[in-house]
UniProtKB/Swiss-Prot annotation:
It comes from Bacillus mycoides (strain KBAB4) (Bacillus weihenstephanensis). The RNAP catalytic core consists of 2 alpha, 1 beta, 1 beta' and 1 omega subunit. When a sigma factor is associated with the core the holoenzyme is formed, which can initiate transcription. It holds the Pfam family RNA_pol_Rpb1_3. Binds 1 Mg(2+) ion per subunit. This is DNA-directed RNA polymerase subunit beta'. The lineage of its organism: Bacteria, Bacillati, Bacillota, Bacilli, Bacillales. Zn(2+) 1 binds at C60, C62, C75, C78. It catalyses: RNA(n) + a ribonucleoside 5'-triphosphate = RNA(n+1) + diphosphate.
């Protein structure tokens, strides 16, 4: 048996008849399956034991030989070999066909491969194969052409006239004869000559034929093998037959299809032996052809063969296709043992890296470990008695279980797993009950809540797997989100509210202005009711143990509140004392104004100052990010746990609740609405007089009501008490926002109707006042559309992620530096005057391609190939530099992946990316995961043409599939000046005057111009509003412009929705879309014109001929959508498991393709370790070394040591 981790590539090809016979263990001659009385397989039937092996281990059919000792003996009575029953999963049989039949994949696929080889149309082929026409196989000395079709009548006429000087025949035999006669070399040379002159359709056809013929010539497949003489029969265990209760049998559809083939084949043999009339034989041959077609691909031609209840039978092709097919069901997704699932509940007392596992579940999952330990401790004599003990749940089992699960991480996964944080490792602790306990801070990453969600548990078994789980996957390690490098474990809801309440300040609170010698005294005073958490007090600065205070500050008093003293205790010692929610306080030190001299009048000073704002969710996030930046993972996870505990404790103490009395209705509301209504009446008057159009009236009414709502919202927010519980919830970022509050207390505002158009009648009531029946009805549209949208969006977003993963799955960091001399020039991304993504955001974590100097002083800010950190990026942005040349995945020279320098920092760890990181998958997940947050709808604001641009998820799909966008912009193909804008009939024309020529562009009706007369314009820039078609842009400009455009557009969509994604993820995806070139002229290379080639293959082919001083080939870059790009990948396994399985496999078989197993999917399919991360060769030769207790003190010590 081949060791799965040791072979280099996998090859697919056409099977010759001899090859099929060599696989086979015997011929299947009868259609019988199982004898229904003895339940034994029939001899020579589809389940025959002599051919396929015994049904029971080490036992022949007749029972003469039983037991292992006869291993390998072939029984002299029944002829069955004594061996394991499992060989019935691998031994094949065959059927010798009485007449050749064509293989439907090669005859019916698009384009028809047989048709291309023979230069016949698929129609003609069909007529010959299904016995409707004769084809001339040898013309002899008659005026007939070879391959000419003849009807029955014509054939008879020619037979009478010329006798047997020519040969014509029907069916697959005739095609086989033609295929055998073909001389590949001659045909190829002939086509190459023809290509030099051919144009138009003849050229395309010639290129297609050349491709197929070259494929046959290079692969060693013979075209005649597309016609089958021998049909392989797959092993019986792969098409099982099982007895149901009640004596009936359930069988795989394949058995029915094979039975039909065998029946017809046997009938044909009998007819041939009897010498039956040709018309009967022909009919039988046609039926045999159809039976084989149905077996290989049922329903591809004509009506599918149906089983009971008119259900089409599943043929061999259907076994591979689709979500339920072999590829996606069994090869890419397998069920695993040592797993369980249960409902999750919150575990607020867990540490960051812990989870609670129900006792019963843990016992079942860790059974083998517990049994071994029971035997090891002498509590059981052997494994069997240990198993019995566990089944009877002896008390000592629990103690052993406790010791077994210590330090043994488990993986928790919640479906849908949208990104890598959907599976994380935890240390289990045993809990009573039957629910899994989950740490509240990891909920964001899993997108989990406790309303009945379920999660799955998996146990990593081997010590390597455990080490990987602990080092790479522990929840405490996964603090940053891979998509943007921001902390993903920020406190939410109650935790935010508690910390917000804790850091509030209140004027005139009890005990204001008291002075304490240290924090403990202040907390004691609070516990005894002398001061409140919100009271502003003074504490001796020297008692607050903080490294950032200067000596002078330590001699003064620090003005703060009791709550903030408590809050600051959770932060690391060398962190600034945080007294106000500002970045300067967070990153540098506590502002000096909070320190006052001892002996000053504290009460007066405090009374004269404004209240300082409390800490909202955003500030807490910034604190976490800053702690992570300075102290790395261990300290951060400890601090997070402390922050969580504080939050829960003080939100409980605060007792913040919501009642109807908290919602105060605005007094001036009626006035504002009256004013708005008067304006609306005025607009309607103008419309009736014909002064404005229907569109303008609609737009104005909408904007009047929107403004009215905004005014009400503004006034509400001003009139709100800062202590109002609802305000506190929304201000802290725990739940809700200003707009929710406006709907409760102000007015609901405008609603959209089911088609998405805004209804111009606003809902004037608020929820506090109550809605009228009509208002309630209108507002139900929106709610229902929301639900329907969400359901559709989830499916769409999931499919987008699947396509993204597929196209980028083989992008892995392969080397340290590719040594490229190209880079990408980047600046801030702007839309009009609004900055969508700042230069700072785009620079952090990238390597500089060229040295960056200060524009005024000329001082060097960044040197070439230096990593740009946050601090450097700030300096660069402040210095006024507009653009920086950086290393980018776009310009990386690495084959099948990227290098460390071009990729930059790994956002998930905040450190340099490691060789072996699967950055393609990370990129796909980072773009796909927020997909569900994007909107579905195209906004209709009264149907103005320019406004109906696609946004949200549909726009992302449009970009990545490289489709022609809706509302496409007209672009200029030359550099020049706008010379004229003319009105022609009902539309406009724009004339661009270049240096050499002028170009005229017709502007489609309803499009809005973006240019003015006399304005200079460069090629590839828009003349009208709208989205550019990237394929057009590629024709007019170069790859770089298209890459930048696509990157900019994707970022625009996500940032508009408030989702941040690192540029590098989009770069990886766009790079995969631009991998291929189309050869326009082959020069003296051996590539074929018109074919799609990988850029690297193309440069290799050219390098070969240039060394000999010959003519190189030329090619144009091609932009492929992600679906097309996935199907064009070099790996046929990856493409076949994605979509269009049969087409991909047909093509691969003819070309005799080799799959070099470079990507992840191919290796998952054949069961190898994936070539990423620790599965890479450079990490495979690694041993685990036991470390002594001394160096175990460092948490998460390096476990890997090179051999």
């Amino acid at each position: 048996m081949i060791d799965v981790n040791n072979f280099e590539y996998m090859k697919i090809g056409l099977a010759s008849p001899d090859k099929i016979r060599s696989w086979s263990y015997g011929e299947v001659k009868k259609p019988e399956t199982i004898n229904y009385r003895t339940l034994k397989p029939e001899k020579d039937g589809l389940f025959c034991e002599r051919i396929f092996g015994p049904q029971k281990d080490w036992e022949c059919h007749c029972g003469k030989y039983k037991r292992v000792r006869y291993k390998g003996v072939v029984c002299d009575r029944c002829g069955v070999e004594v061996t394991r029953a499992k060989v019935r999963r691998e031994r094949m049989g065959h059927i010798e066909l009485a007449a050749p039949v064509s293989h439907i994949w090669y005859f019916k696929g698009i384009p028809s491969r047989m048709g291309l080889v023979l230069d016949m149309s698929p129609r003609a082929l069909e007529e010959v194969i299904y016995f409707a026409s004769y084809v001339v196989t040898e013309s002899g000395d008659t005026p007939l052409d070879k391959k000419q079709l003849l009807s029955e009548k014509e054939y008879r006429a020619y037979r009478d006239r010329y006798g047997s000087t020519f040969h014509a025949a029907m069916g697959a035999e005739a095609i086989k004869k033609l295929l055998q006669d073909i001389d590949l070399d001659k045909e190829v040379d002939f086509l190459k000559e023809e290509l030099k002159t051919a144009q138009g359709q003849r050229r395309t056809r010639a290129i297609k034929r050349l491709e197929v013929l070259e494929a046959f010539r290079n692969s060693g497949n013979h075209p005649s093998w597309m016609i089958l003489e021998v049909l392989p029969v797959i092993p019986p265990e792969l098409r099982p037959m099982v007895q149901l209760d009640g004596g009936r049998f359930a069988t795989s559809d394949l058995n029915d299809l094979y039975r039909r083939v065998i029946n017809r084949n046997n009938r044909l043999k009998r007819l041939l032996d009897l010498g039956a009339p040709s018309i009967i034989v022909q009919n039988e041959k046609r039926m045999l052809q159809e039976a084989v077609d149905a077996l290989i691909d049922n329903g591809r031609r004509g009506r599918p063969v149906t089983g009971p209840g008119n259900r089409p039978l599943k043929s061999l092709s259907h076994m591979l296709k689709g979500k339920q097919g072999r590829f996606r069901q069994n090869l890419l997704g397998k069920r695993v043992d040592y797993s369980g699932r249960s409902v999750i509940v919150v575990g607020p007392n867990l540490k960051m890296y812990q989870c609670g596992l129900p006792k019963e579940m843990a016992l079942e999952l860790f059974k083998p470990f517990v049994m071994k330990e029971l035997v090891g401790k002498g509590l059981a004599h052997n494994i069997k008695s240990a198993k019995r003990k566990i089944e009877r749940v002896h008390p000592e089992v629990w103690d052993v279980l406790e010791s077994v699960i210590k330090e043994h991480p488990v993986l928790l996964n919640r479906a849908p797993t949208l990104h890598r944080l959907g599976i994380q490792a935890f240390e289990p602790t045993l809990v009573e009950g039957r629910a899994i306990r989950l740490h509240p801070l990891v909920c964001t990453a899993y997108n989990a809540d406790f309303d009945g969600d379920q999660m799955a548990v998996h146990v990593p078994l081997s010590s390597e797997a455990q080490a990987e789980a602990r080092i790479l996957m522990l929840a405490a390690q996964n603090i940053l989100n891979p998509k943007d490098g921001k902390p993903v474990v920020t406190p939410s809801q109650d935790m935010v509210l508690g910390n917000y309440y804790l850091t509030l300040e209140r004027e005139g609170a009890i005990g204001e202005g008291m002075v304490f010698k240290d924090a403990n005294e202040a907390i004691l005073a609070y516990q005894n009711g002398y001061v409140h958490l919100h009271t502003r007090v003074a504490v001796a600065a020297s008692s607050v143990n903080n490294v950032t205070f200067t000596e002078e500050q330590k001699s003064k008093l620090l003005l703060t509140t009791v709550g903030k003293l408590i809050f600051n205790e959770i932060l690391p010692e060398s962190f600034p004392y945080i007294n106000e929610p500002t970045n300067s306080n967070l990153e540098k030190e506590t502002p000096a104004e909070y320190f006052v001299e001892k002996g000053a009048n504290i009460k007066e000073i405090i009374a004269s100052r404004e209240e300082v704002a409390p800490f909202s969710k955003k500030i807490l996030g910034n604190i976490i990010a800053e702690v992570f930046k300075r102290f790395q993972i261990t300290e951060t996870s400890r601090m997070l746990d402390r922050m969580k505990n504080l939050g829960f404790k003080y939100s409980t103490k605060a007792g913040i609740t919501v009642g109807v009395s908290d919602i105060l209705v605005l007094g001036e509301k009626d006035e504002i609405l009256h004013e708005a209504q008067a304006k609306v009446d005025n607009v309607i008057k103008q419309f009736r007089r014909g002064l404005i159009t229907e569109e303008e009236r609609y737009d104005r009414v909408i904007s009047i009501w929107s403004n009215a709502k905004d005014v009400i919202q503004g006034k509400l927010m001003k009139s709100l008490n800062k202590r109002n519980p609802i305000f506190m919830m929304s201000d802290s970022g725990a739940r809700g926002n200003a707009s929710n509050f406006t709907q409760l207390a102000g007015m609901r505002g405008l609603m959209a109707n089911p088609s998405g158009r805004i209804i111009e009648l606003p809902i004037k009531s608020s929820f506090r006042e109550g809605l009228t029946v009509l208002e309630y009805f209108i507002s139900t549209h929106g709610a229902r559309k929301g639900l329907a949208d969400t359901a559709l969006k989830t499916a769409d977003s999931g499919y987008l992620t699947r396509r993204l993963v597929d196209v980028a799955q083989d992008v892995i960091v392969r080397q340290d530096d590719c040594g490229t001399d190209r880079g990408l020039l980047i600046g801030a991304i702007k839309e009009g005057n609004e900055v969508i993504e700042s230069l700072y955001d785009r620079l952090v974590g990238r390597f500089a391609r060229k040295t960056v100097k200060h524009p005024e002083t000329g001082e060097v800010l960044v040197v070439e190939n230096q990593l740009i950190t946050e601090d450097i990026a700030h300096i660069v942005e402040k210095s006024g530099v507009e653009t920086v040349n950086i290393r980018s995945a776009f310009t990386c020279n690495t084959r099948h992946g990227v290098c460390k320098k071009c990729y930059g920092r790994n956002l998930a760890t905040g450190t340099d990316v490691e060789v072996g990181e699967a950055v393609g998958i990370i990129a796909a997940q980072s773009i796909g995961e927020p997909g569900t947050q994007l909107t579905m709808r195209t906004f209709h604001t009264g149907g103005v043409a320019g406004d109906d641009i696609t946004q949200g998820l549909p726009r992302i799909q449009e970009i990545f599939e490289a489709r022609n966008p809706k509302g496409q912009a007209v672009i200029s193909e030359i550099d020049g000046v706008i010379a004229a804008i003319n009105d022609v009939k009902d539309r406009q024309e724009v004339v661009v005057q270049g240096e050499v020529e002028a170009r005229t562009y017709a502007i489609p009706y309803g499009a809005r111009l973006k240019v003015t007369l006399g304005q200079p314009i460069s090629h590839g820039k828009e003349l009208t509003e709208g989205s550019i078609d990237p394929k057009e842009l590629l024709k007019v400009t170069d790859i770089t412009a298209v890459q930048e455009y696509l990157l900019r557009e994707v970022q625009k969509v996500y940032r508009m929705q408030g989702v941040e994604i690192g540029d590098k993820h989009v770069e990886v995806m766009v790079r995969q879309m631009l991998r291929k070139v189309r050869v326009s002229d082959a020069g003296e290379t051996d590539v074929l014109p018109g074919t799609l080639l990988d850029i690297h293959q193309f440069t290799d082919a050219n390098a070969k001929v240039l060394l000999k001083g010959k003519q190189p080939a030329t090619a144009r870059p091609v932009l492929l959508g992600i679906t097309k790009a996935s199907l064009e990948t070099d790996s046929f396994l990856s493409a076949a498991s994605f979509q269009e399985t049969t087409r991909v496999l047909t093509d691969a078989a003819i070309k005799g393709k080799r799959d070099e197993l470079l990507g992840l999917k191919e290796n998952v399919i054949i069961g190898k370790l994936v070539p990423a991360g620790t599965g890479m060769n450079r990490y495979r030769k690694v041993d685990l070394v036991k470390t002594t207790q001394d160096n175990m003190n460092v948490e998460n010590d390096e476990v890997y040591v090179e051999q």
